[in-house]
Amino acid sequence: MFSRRYHIGRLYHEVYLCRRWEGNSDAALSQDRINKNNTYKDHLRTLEILARQQLNRSREQVPSPAEVEDFFQNEKKNWSDAAARYEALSGVQTKVLAEGQKLSTVNSQLSTLSAQWNPARMVSTGANISKQAIEKRPCFLCDSNRPAEQHALPVLGQYQLLINPFPILPKHFTIPTREHTPQTIKGHFQDLFKIARQMPDYMVFYNGPLCGASCPDHMHLQAGSRGIAPLERDWKSVYEPKLKPFAEGISILTDYACQVLVIRTENIAEAQKRFDYIYNLLPLHEGETEPRMNIVCWKDGEEVVTLVFPRAKHRPDCYFAQGDEQLLISPGALDMCGLLITPREQDFRKLTPEMAIDILREVSLTPTLSQGEGAKAF
């Protein structure tokens, strides 16, 4: 371990220089002794190379469920601030806005929606993501700017698994790239798919730059506990039977607060092909680098279910309203899945099923269908 942390040190020279030539202690030894010493050093070098190869292979993979659980518990044990927020999360107030058929009279939608009053999320909901604000603040996902207590678990070689210190879900992770690159799903969709497949206890999600990402200058995914967000929790019993064909290999969910495009497959290449179809179908807003969307994935049997939420707006009008008309809700992937996050108590108390549905519909992009068999336009 010493040689892996420091470039200069006794073990480093022992392992990597390996041979000791004229001018040092081996020069005075017999040839037989020198050969034995060199054999021993070569053996050390081989052990170190094999250990590094194994370490590199592990970094190229998704951590096992046991590794993720151990990491999560260790982070809470050693990071008191984060542990306190997870403890507080168990006591946050939630309320069911509507259940199943009760919403059938509200905008003709069959939905289950919930709200969570989570004051700690003000840091995200209230985030200023203007270009000027981003340029002025250090990136909190880069290694050099993270708290000393926050450690990382390598994922797929180019990502790091971090405990999210401002959780929404009982277990909540941020998965940033090791390099500081802008938030974009292009080139990262298959990684999202792989992580969801290898972390079956979690839903893995992506917030676009203007769709809930509080750090749009650094590419990151997120993962969190399953069985909490209503759309994922009730998928098999309520929503999956309601799917309709949209395009080849793609379904659409219309019996929900907003329309959702759905990909179900165990084949990663097929998933990429179907996602590319959706990606290329969505409009690109002027001055932006990718279509607006949220994506949520989870493993369902052998398949991975991928939900794509096309977005029209970053935040609803009520976010910018004044006085009693204001609702400080900035929808991300979890909000789109029916768990609306309200940092302020007054918004939590005031939010109704009708308001929640109106917010999700307002920020969503609704496709124009051609006889229910595909999209004409967005």
Predicted regions and their residues:
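Active-site microenvironments that recognize anionic phosphate/pyrophosphate groups
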Residues: 1-191, 214, 226-364, 378
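Single, functionally critical "micro-switch" positions that shape active/binding sites
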Residues: 176, 217-219, 369
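An anion-binding catalytic pocket shared by soluble metabolic enzymes
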Residues: 195
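Active-site beta-strand/loop microenvironment that shapes enzyme catalytic pockets
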Residues: 198-232
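A cross-taxon signal for low-complexity, glycine/charged-rich
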Residues: 372-375
